[in-house]
Amino acid sequence: MKGSPVSRPDFRSRLGAILSAVATDLVTEHRFVELEASEPPWLDTGLHVEAGDLVTVVLAGRVFFDQAADLWLDPSVQVWTRVGGHGPIERGSRATNTFRCANSGTVELGNAAPAEWVDRDGRITTDPGLYAFMTGGTTVGLIRWAHGVDPAGALRDLAAAGDVENLLMAEADRLD
């Protein structure tokens, strides 16, 4: 892919300002994690969830195959999630995704390229050393919704107060 998305620091600053103003009756916890392209799967985010919790993932960044040629992979196809060291692994079809946690534990993030998943738990057979050749990375915003909150409605309300590259509204639309 080619192009110039929002910078990772700008994304973190803008989304952080929006989420910092949210009441705890909507969002139980939010955090940001830097997932560098050179990091093999799986990175523990420290966000603890219970089975059944709803989590929204919001992504910004680029993973470069060739930075000089500006050839990069969009985070929507690069970043995968799982909970507690077990599958199912999943990702969204865009730079946002909301999922219901199948397990209790911490949310983990995995870079896909250059790996190929061999099972639903996210094991790889690729040499983890190959990740050292990748550059760039993804800033990942994680939102753990309070029990009983409708993420689509909450995301619409957040987007009305301020959005980052229309990511919050796009996820609300996807959920509806």
Language-model-detected regions and their locations in the chain:
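Gly-Asp-aromatic-enriched flexible segments
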Residues: 3-176
